[in-house]
Amino acid sequence: MIRVCICGGGSLAHVCAGVLSFQSEVEVNIFTRQPERWSQHIIVTDHEGKTYKGNLNVISNNPQEAMHDCNIIFLCLPGFAIESTLECIKPYIGNAVVGSIVCSTGFFFTAHRVLGNNARLFGFQRVPFIARTTEYGHAANLLGYKPQVSIAVENMEDKEEFRKIVESLWLTPTKLLHSHYEASLTNSNPILHTGRLYSMWKDWNGELYSHNILFYKEWTVEASKTLIAMDKEFMQLLDVLPVTPGAIPSLLEYYESHDAISLTEKIRSIVAFQDITSPMKEVDGGWIPDFESRYFTEDFPYGLKIIIDLAKENNIHTPNLNKVFEWGMSKCMKKSET
């Protein structure tokens, strides 16, 4: 029996809870600030109608209770919550492996600082599922699987055996990365999201939109040009870090494209992305950007910032990354000051 404690209550936490607890040899605990909102039973439905019905073992806001006898402690948390959560659970980790579904917001760097360099850690390079909560604590939709995921693993005697466990638990072909940099640094959310947001709203001056823009389906060539410029600088950073060539493909390579036009067509056509909207909020008369969305509060100060800081440390010139970062942070700072 494998016992997993999932920390968090977002969409990915819901889907992981359902998929893992559906498996007969897995027990799932939930560590959450809102245990009263969770049911002992969870249902996850994928895009083809397959359902994962699971029973949750322990649901608690008490870390000692939630972590008891767990083999794996798995964080499904926003970047700002990682350090405080690790500090909170540190006394109760015991021999468990600590992992994160997202590493691009600093999981490994923070875990090294809080738990020490000998902690047993793992983390995904990209999330294994596209997830949306439909009823908090009860149900979620699994909108898409990944054909393959990659994980970084540290301080484990048999990394291959652990890779097999992850592959089995998350129902996705899994390969091992060579260093935590390969999981921590990604051109997914920190560049894909931020570049798109910059292209959408860098010149926004208060006008109303008639609808919530579809983030991917209404993708623009301008957004693709911004991404390609940012990604080129990101690739220059990877060249000077202990990253295996090809471990983190360029965005053009990942999306099987060769220029801004083909990248735009590819992103617009991804079925699992079709209904994903932009971080906007409805007001009288229309829609406006929501600068308090996690797209801003997560991807700029925790995702893109890691890349910016490493580039500075390694003397990599990143004018496009800097431009987008400074714009995004100016929006975050304005909201934090109100």
Regions found by a protein language model. Give the residues of each.
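Rossmann-like NAD(P)(H) cofactor-binding subdomain of soluble oxidoreductases
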Residues: 72-75, 79-140
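Internal, well-ordered alpha/beta segment that forms a basic, Gly-enriched binding/recognition surface
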Residues: 116-117, 125-172
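Glycine-rich, highly charged phosphate/nucleotide-binding loops
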Residues: 50-65, 79-87
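NAD(P)+-binding Rossmann beta1-loop-alpha1 motif at the extreme N-terminus of oxidoreductases
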Residues: 1-53, 65-67
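Nucleotide donor/acceptor-binding cores
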Residues: 2, 96, 147-149
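Active-site-lining helix/loop region of Rossmann-like oxidoreductase modules
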Residues: 150-253
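NAD(P)-dependent Rossmann-like dehydrogenase/reductase catalytic/cofactor-binding core
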Residues: 206, 210, 217, 224-338
